[in-house]
Amino acid sequence: MAPKQLKKIENPVVSSSEEEESASSGESATSGEESDSSADSPVKESSKKPVVVSKPSGSKTTTKPESSTAAKRSFEKTDEMSKKKSKNSMGEEDVKKKDETLKKNLFVRLFTEEDEAILLQGFLDFATKKENPSDHIDDFYESIKNSISFDVTKPQLVTKIGNLKKKFNGRVSKGLKKGKNEEVMVFSKASDQNCFDLSRKIWGSNGVLYSKSKNMRQVQLGGSVKVDEDDQEPQKHRFVISTLSSGQELVSYLKVENPNSLGVDDTKWSAKLDKIKDGKQKRKMEKNLKKIQAKEEELSMMRSEFVAAVTNVLSKQDNASYSCK
């Protein structure tokens, strides 16, 4: 008979010491696993953190271009607005500069001293050879315009003649107040003396136009009226009742014979202004007088244009009435 083999004990009974060792080893194993897992967990968390950080960083990278473009657009808008404002301000400055230049051009002296002498000499020659240039302003303008240093217009020419006559009358009135006759008045500047002498030959007491005006009144009234004693000396702005045509009456009132048709004699009031003592009140009055003179220049220009238009129409009517007769 074969001997009986002992059955292999699958689960042998472990002693208490072994159990304790196994338990301790199990605990150490579990603690090792836990330590390993705990050691691994920071690595996992650290590996996850970049992912978490990368998401907002990725979102930032995607949103950064949007914020930069928006910032660029806002910057461009502000830049455009600033450019528009600067353009508007520059435009306003240009308009102001243009207005200032226009205002300055109104008071710029166009006629030189040589032009004044040429104009007076031409006026004197025309009046001596023919008739009053004021009654034939178109012919006189055509004869003198090429001799002036600039492209003078007809209203400018008429206005300048009126101003020269007004200047002459003012100098004569000042001289009479000082006890000086127009024939003995002397000026330091040669150009002023020349213009005064030419003006005296035209509008003086023995001037061409003054003597012609007296003869014209006698002829128009049939020569039956005696010349008044007051007519022996030149008078300003005298209104004459005669048989002149309507066009000639209008011209004699509004044109060169009556440059101050508004009734304001600048020379008279400027002479009175000289008698006032220097001070704020006098300076204020002088400024007002300059403003009045500037306005008179504008009105004189308008008056000349009005006279030219009305005279043209009335002369045609007068010619038509004479032809019918």
Swiss-Prot record:
The keyword Transport does not apply. One of its GO terms (biological process) is regulation of DNA-templated transcription. GO terms for molecular function: transcription cis-regulatory region binding. Belongs to the GeBP family. Residues 23-32, 49-69 have a biased composition (Low complexity). Residues 73-83 have a biased composition (Basic and acidic residues). The keyword Ribonucleoprotein does not apply. This is Probable transcription factor At4g01260. Keywords: Transcription, Transcription regulation. It holds the Pfam family GeBP-like_DBD. It comes from the Eukaryota. Residues 1-98 are annotated as: Disordered.
